[in-house]
From Swiss-Prot:
It is found in: Nucleus. GO terms for biological process: chromatin remodeling. Keywords: Activator, Chromatin regulator, Nucleus, Transcription, Transcription regulation. Component of the SWR1 chromatin remodeling complex. The keyword Nucleus applies. Component of the SWR1 complex which mediates the ATP-dependent exchange of histone H2A for the H2A variant HZT1 leading to transcriptional regulation of selected genes by chromatin remodeling. It holds the Pfam family SWC7. This is SWR1-complex protein 7. Belongs to the SWC7 family. Its main location: nucleus. It comes from the Eukaryota.
Length: 127
């Protein structure tokens, strides 16, 4: 299922933060493998589903079970990096960079023009 770029980016950020916590808590865990095959546990579920961005833009994700969130993460990884070189590894970091770039493009091409139009129409109403 496709979600807004900001929601997917938030999910990747929450998962990345959790992988960093796990790597610091347990030095036997490989940071590289955590970036390629992240652990999605209840801590990720609680942080993500309670976040205000999720409540605002994807409220259907607030009631997810752990298995469903794990499936969402697997789906994001399976989609990969559209438009990137084939030899680019799919990791939490490369995915986050990819979705960050998509979100910036979305803001520049869609959201900012809408805001500009609203401001211009509001300014026109005042005169």
């Amino acid at each position: 299922m496709e979600y807004k770029y900001n929601v997917t980016l938030l999910l990747l950020q929450v998962v990345l933060h959790r992988q960093q916590e796990l790597a610091h808590q347990d030095k036997t865990l490989s940071q590289i493998s955590l970036l390629r095959e992240p652990v999605v546990d209840t801590a990720v579920l609680e942080r993500f589903s309670a976040h205000r961005v999720v409540r605002l833009y994807a409220p259907e994700l607030c009631g997810l079970r752990l298995e469903e969130l794990q499936a969402v993460v697997r789906e994001v990884f399976a989609r990969g990096l559209a438009g990137s070189a084939e030899d680019t590894p799919v990791t939490l970091i490369t995915l986050a960079n990819h979705y960050y770039r998509l979100r910036v493009q979305e803001l520049e091409l869609q959201e900012l023009p809408k805001l500009k139009e609203l401001m211009e129409s509001a300014a026109g109403l005042r005169t």
